[in-house]
């Protein structure tokens, strides 16, 4: 059985929860051959892997969403070749732009015409007519030129992805909807294979939250972008044979966005709790500090600035508190610098940015961990903290509430939940956690029992073994438990 993982903007280029999950999944099934379709912004990412690839990951195909000679409204081109749509192609393209029910097979086939130029199509007469009709129907109160260029910007990366010759596999496993779901749906159309969608966060909601806060897009144009991401997710839900999510509320959101409930299966995350046993603790010198740890990527979605400001307030009451921010800071260097500058401007002491580290070297030395994200799914960092007997302070996003309070499991609270971006509330939680050692230990043990009861890697592996074998059986494929053997890793474009 050959499984093609389709991932956008994460594995194997960026360290994080989803990347770690993909790496763990592939390594959990040495009997399956995996290939990877990795979607990234541009060629600057080419081959820059931060993970050592498993032996059963045999090929990596890279898709660059900005891989074209295009500048907004100022493209240098020798000539414009007209791309003429058939009546059927025109109708389905119009349906897609108008967010109506669309025969996507026609769209997929269109972009696999030989020599079809995305640039020429977007600059051509047919796309102009489609944009004009959409404008006249729904957006005639705004400037048409701005609307037209917005549509071109929206569809450029999607159309570029649709030109990809997707490698053949028995199962396409997309680790999100969005562009991953588009490619997975197209692969199913051309190869007749099965399609599995696994959402960690709800892609549409995450993009919507980003767009609402974004300064580069304003007014009605935010809604136009949001509708585009909804459309892409709906396509993935419609074409998928199965859709998984991490917790019950995520299932509700998927259904709200149009996913048929009979397709959805809740599959919680799982970690190897044994690797986090017997971690090194504090040295005698380190015991003078109360250590608060944050395992994260230094990016805006993790809201590190709120964490730093909350720590500055908390440290006024707990003088021996120390904040350890553990994780890479190179994904958004501008934001990382703003965080460093914030620490300096606040004049706060004892904030350590470690960069990328082996969490096992640090986690045992923490008294509690901290997560101030504005969006999450089911954070692996919380599960890892629990496996190390550490309580957690987390914002009320994603599945954090259930991870901290449980779902009537009888284990009790494993930390403190706060509102997002609430500096005072987070600071108070840090003080409370720091001064109550007995409560810290009780919460840490509750988390340890919870993670071992519901979130172990062997449990997750068994669920996905059942899912993968089910797809294999339905396609009459051979299934063996023997490790897949390959001698050469080949990276292809």
Protein language model annotation of sequence segments:
Residues 336-356:
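Nucleotide-activated donor-binding/catalytic signature segment of Leloir-type glycosyltransferases, i.e.
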Residues 280-313, 324-326:
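Conserved donor-binding/catalytic core segment of Leloir-type glycosyltransferases
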Residues 374:
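Aromatic "clamp/platform" in nucleotide-sugar-dependent glycosyltransferases that forms part
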Residues 322-337:
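Glycosyltransferase donor-sugar binding loop
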Residues 425, 432, 439-454, 460-470:
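A short, well-ordered alpha-helix in the C-terminal region of glycosyltransferases
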Residues 249, 270:
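Carbohydrate-associated surface elements
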Residues 406-423, 432-437:
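Conserved acidic donor-binding segment of nucleotide-sugar-dependent glycosyltransferases
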